[in-house]
């Protein structure tokens, strides 16, 4: 059993129940609603590399993305050799037919989709953006090529050792996230621009996938590679975690500051002191909670509203103190307070970072995926590789979440 992901509104989730078979389950009421089976794969169609990959925890048999609760899903079977891993199918689950098939030059790593756009990430660090209404290719973004062009313009040549590292897969993977709103705000990680010799993926690009134009560029959101990324439903917030996994940061995707302040850091939380591989994060529909899960026995839930109120109180007290000292005019107080409320958290020492508001204890020997349902506030869905689907309530006062119900699949 291998859980893949929830859809955009957490009304369904997908899982691999047996080889070459992918199942979609409805969350409320809980039950199986679709099963996709592929023909039996012969030994000739699965090469050694693919079989080795399939045994690892990092490689799913399928890459899937559902379109809310509609009958359309995008699916790639990565368990049938490298040729199949380059083919993406759009499937109608009601008719059990393939609507269209797309073939890419490299293996498909991830798919994100909403009602307007589908974005496909390849192992070559390329992002293909499609109009979902007609499956027309609108744009191709090459993250690695952009970095290599920068290196050429700066040094006049590209180091072969850099290209070699990329081909050998020694660098971290590009991460992508697309908001479920029709605005289609796409966020993806990019190679560090401030250090042209660095091939760390710790920059963040905010891209308008509806109008095909860049919106914002966030430099060095973490010291190390960004290992996990998620975006709010409305596309206004993006959350990041590095490969170390101790700090979680949330940024504004748009540049709304009237003062030049660099990255728009909204929130910063400490997940823990020990390193952790965070593999999924979710922001709830109201933008109050952020949940993250990794290779530990705890799912952390952070309260963004609570920290925002604390930041406002801190900025108000600091701006008032400055006024008393005669360092600010009354006219500039509101502007400065607004600026400070957005940036003050970056000045707080690490040891004072807020930790989780609520948590869920889980089995750290299995993988879990998260969902915040649109129709139920203060509720979290957890689907796990051990075949359990759990519904949890977030307590108003915080602390350990309350298990509401549990189902087996």
Curated annotation (Swiss-Prot):
This protein's record includes keyword tRNA-binding: no
Gene: ATG21
Organism: Eremothecium gossypii (strain ATCC 10895 / CBS 109.51 / FGSC 9923 / NRRL Y-1056) (Yeast)
PANTHER family xref list: WD-REPEAT PROTEIN INTERACTING WITH PHOSPHOINOSIDES WIPI -RELATED
Domain notes: Contains a beta-propeller domain involved in specific binding to phosphatidylinositol 3,5-bisphosphate (PIP2).
Lineage of producing organism: Eukaryota, Fungi, Dikarya, Ascomycota, Saccharomycotina
This protein's record includes keyword Cytoplasm: yes
Coiled-coil zones: none
Span(s) of short sequence motif L/FRRG motif: 269-273
The protein's name: Autophagy-related protein 21
CC terms in the record's Gene Ontology section: cytosol; endosome; fungal-type vacuole membrane; phagophore assembly site membrane
The WD repeat ranges on this chain: 1-35, 221-261, 273-312, 361-402
Subcellular localization(s) per the UniProt record: Cytoplasm; Membrane; Vacuole membrane
């Amino acid at each position: 059993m291998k859980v893949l992901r929830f859809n955009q509104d957490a009304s369904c989730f997908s899982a691999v129940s047996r080889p070459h078979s992918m199942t979609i389950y409805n969350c409320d009421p809980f039950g199986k609603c679709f099963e996709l089976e592929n023909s039996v794969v012969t030994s000739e169609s699965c090469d050694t590399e693919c079989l080795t990959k399939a045994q690892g925890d990092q490689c799913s048999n399928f890459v899937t993305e559902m379109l809310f609760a509609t009958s359309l899903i995008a699916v790639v079977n990565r368990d049938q050799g490298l040729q199949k891993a380059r083919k993406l199918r759009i499937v109608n689950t009601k008719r059990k037919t393939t609507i269209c098939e797309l073939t890419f030059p490299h293996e498909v790593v991830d798919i994100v989709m909403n009602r307007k756009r589908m974005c496909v990430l390849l192992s070559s660090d390329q992002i293909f953006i499609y109009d979902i209404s007609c499956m027309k290719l609108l744009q191709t973004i090459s993250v690695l090529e952009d970095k290599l062009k920068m290196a050429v313009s700066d040094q006049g040549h590209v180091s072969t050792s850099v290209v070699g590292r990329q081909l050998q897969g020694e660098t971290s993977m590009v991460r992508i996230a697309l908001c479920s709103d029709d605005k289609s705000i796409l966020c993806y990680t990019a190679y560090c621009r401030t250090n042209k010799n660095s091939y760390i993926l710790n920059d963040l690009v905010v891209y308008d996938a509806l109008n095909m134009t860049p919106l914002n560029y966030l430099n060095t959101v973490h010291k190390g590679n960004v290992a996990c990324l998620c975006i709010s439903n409305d596309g206004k917030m993006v959350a990041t975690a590095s490969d170390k996994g101790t700090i979680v940061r949330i940024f504004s995707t748009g540049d709304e500051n009237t003062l030049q302040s660099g990255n728009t850091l909204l929130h910063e939380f400490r997940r823990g002191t020990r390193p952790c591989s965070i593999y999924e994060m979710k922001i709830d529909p109201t933008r109050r909670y952020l949940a993250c899960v990794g290779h530990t026995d705890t799912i952390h839930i952070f309260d963004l509203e609570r920290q925002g109120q604390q930041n406002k109180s801190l900025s108000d007290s600091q701006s008032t103190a400055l006024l008393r000292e005669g360092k600010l005019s009354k006219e500039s107080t509101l502007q400065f307070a607004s600026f400070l409320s957005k940036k003050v958290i970056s000045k707080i020492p690490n040891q004072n970072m807020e930790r989780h508001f609520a948590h869920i204890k889980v089995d750290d020997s299995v993988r879990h995926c998260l969902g915040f349902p649109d129709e139920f506030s203060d509720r979290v869905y957890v689907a796990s590789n051990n075949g359990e689907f759990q519904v949890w309530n977030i307590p108003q006062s915080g602390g350990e979440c309350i298990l509401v119900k549990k189902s087996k699949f």
